[in-house]
Amino acid sequence: MKIVIIGAGIAGCAAYLELCKHLPRSGSETYEIIIYEAYSTDLNVTAKEREQKQEENTHSSTLLVGGGLGIGANGLNVLKRLDEDLLKDVVRSGYVASTFNMKSKNGWSLVSIDATGYTSSTEQRMHMVAASRHSMWQALRSRIPDEHIINKRISEVVACPNGMNLIHFVDGSPSVEADLIIGADGVRSTAKRAIFPEAKEDPYPPNYE
């Protein structure tokens, strides 16, 4: 069975690791899992290096993209079940926070929320961890072999009548068939267009100030 993940951001890398852990390893069926990503996934790439490559958009592999993340107890439990060493790497890259404070753009305090939660196996409370988006991505990406990530931009995904899926590439290279495709390629997802071909662009896109 061939599984293709589109996008090597946090979601794509996490999906890859989950599949590797939970897919059955016994029996006659074998699994091939490949990630296609349009941008560089080098662990140590910097924003300046990306500018030198003249790439218009940014991605998870850029040190400055996405700012910070607050990972709650439920998210930390997911990381723990996946790999305890992964959880430790993420915690070490950030800091714990017992409260989550929301403020207006003028700095006024709007609400303060308890940011602790219970673990799944014990009654011990777990604090939220605040970390950079890149450090979270880096911890996931470092556990994926380089040869399982292919740097290619996908132009179209087609669901075929025979049950297979066909992936076309922007560079015109030969198309690839896959039994299962996981779309982890962001809000302007190419994979999503294959499922909802008639869907229009978001009429109310987010506005960042």
Task: Put a short name on every predicted segment.
Residues 7-9, 186:
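A short acidic Gly-Thr/Ser loop motif
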